[in-house]
């Protein structure tokens, strides 16, 4: 993915393909929301896939919250010169996508949420009481997936390093508090954007009842399930995820021309 990686001004981002822009928002731990397969597939199908690095650990602590990240995404979309985009978010990225849609509905042609936070906030994890215990962190990372083998050593190392970095831990807890403050339950019924929900039936972070609640509260939502799948559907079942997303894009007339 390196050759598609760009740094311009205050933004670092991955970009591939030409066409309808899909802006992808990752979760707290980038490695746990790996969109490689989605990026490869849709960049060859008439979409421009753009994945900005969100400043989760690099912004001032006062700007370490869902609302400030949503504003960052809006500024990035303006910087790129996009008129309207399809927003795709996983976990915290889904919450940021939702808040962005609430604040700037005119910028969002469609919304795709997978394992999104915004309604159910144990999604943010705890204060990692045993964060120095590598095996404990490994089990936490494995629990994100249906198949624990998805939590590679490289990925577990990334999570372990993050939770043992004091500043990152403080910011993670700050974001968790912000996510609870910015619960979306009251806002969702007013959000009429076409929304695609793709959920793992075995998601233990944002369980299936969360997807059902999103589906009930969002007026124009369509819910798709993936079996034997945890919190990161686009990583665990990329082909199925891509097929469902492509179907939805076709049915909602958001398909690239």
Give the label of every model feature segment.
Residues 131-193:
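Conserved alpha/beta-hydrolase catalytic His-Asp/Glu region
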């Amino acid at each position: 993915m390196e050759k598609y990686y760009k740094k311009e001004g205050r933004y670092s981002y991955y970009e591939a393909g030409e066409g309808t822009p899909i802006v992808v928002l990752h979760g707290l731990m980038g490695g746990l929301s790996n969109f490689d397969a989605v990026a490869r597939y849709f960049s060859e199908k008439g979409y421009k896939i753009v994945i900005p690095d969100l400043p989760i650990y690099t912004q001032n602590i006062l700007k370490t919250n869902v609302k400030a990240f949503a504003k960052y995404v809006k500024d990035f979309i303006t910087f790129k010169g996009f008129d309207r985009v399809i927003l795709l978010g996983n976990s915290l990225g889904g919450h940021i996508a939702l808040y962005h849609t609430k604040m700037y509905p005119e910028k969002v042609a469609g919304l795709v949420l997978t394992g999104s936070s915004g309604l159910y906030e144990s999604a943010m994890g705890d204060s990692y009481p045993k964060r120095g215990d590598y095996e404990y962190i490994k089990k936490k990372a494995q629990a994100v997936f249906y198949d624990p083998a998805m939590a590679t050593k490289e990925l577990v190392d990334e999570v372990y390093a993050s939770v043992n970095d004091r500043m990152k831990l403080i910011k993670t807890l700050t974001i968790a508090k912000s996510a609870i403050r910015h619960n979306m339950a009251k806002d969702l019924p007013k959000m009429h954007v076409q929304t695609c929900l793709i959920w793992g039936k075995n998601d233990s972070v944002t369980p299936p009842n969360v997807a059902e609640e999103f589906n009930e509260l969002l007026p124009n939502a369509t819910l798709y399930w993936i079996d034997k799948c945890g919190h990161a559907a686009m990583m665990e079942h990329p082909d199925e995820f891509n097929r469902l997303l492509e179907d939805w894009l076709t049915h909602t007339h958001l398909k690239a021309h």
